Amino acid sequence: ALFAVPYTMTDASQVHLVAEDEVGNRAEASFIDKFTPRPITTDTIQLNDAYINKVVPEIMGQSPEVADQGDPVKNYVEINRNLRKKNAATLVDLAHKSEPRFLWTQPFQPMPNAKITAAFAQRRTYLYNGKPIDQEDHLGFDMASVTHDAVPASNDGKVVLARFFGIYGNAVIIDHGYGLMSLYGHMSQLEVKEGQMVKRGQELGRSGQTGLAGGDHLHFTMLLQGLPVTPVEWWDPHWIQDRIARKLGAALPYHP
């Protein structure tokens, strides 16, 4: 099985393997012997009325689960905080339906010729009129290229979401099997449908600035059992070979 340690965890002894038989006998043990806490960087996002009045109506118009707070700034916080949580819960639900087989055989690849403008595990404080109104964690990589650039699939898999998806705007999520997924957000247009099988490098759509995006870019992240994990490791063929393929052996038909 593949599992992820939450990016906020500082003590791996909190992770336990639990076994229980049919009559309720239960055994529990810690099994992680090497763990390095992930540093969380910080950033400040300056909000203005022009940005808020652009993103809030679009998201609320396509997200009926967002309760209108009667004020654009309050609506922004409702989206940034509570819709973000609902989106995260959906990611966990999707993981429960992941294919029980590996759908990929090659290393994952990033968007080509793109500049990274924001990285994984960045704690953002949002300021409006100089005062903090929210704080949330950015859990992916923002990758900017030319406007409406082609967005390729990072690896083979099955499209499990292709629609407007809350804070991510127009988004695609690919299931790579056993709870491993990749997410592509803020796209201007989508070229794939839910249920479709895609190949590594196949165009999924075009970059854009839908959802909470302030400019044209791709928000990309990897997910394991619904938990965001840093894409950097999955882009590294040596990391996959050492941490995944070597341990799984013939169960993973990996060809770096």
Regions found by a protein language model. Give the residues of each.
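Non-catalytic extracellular/periplasmic "stalk"
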Residues: 1-122, 127
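Catalytic cores of peptidoglycan-degrading enzymes
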Residues: 109-255
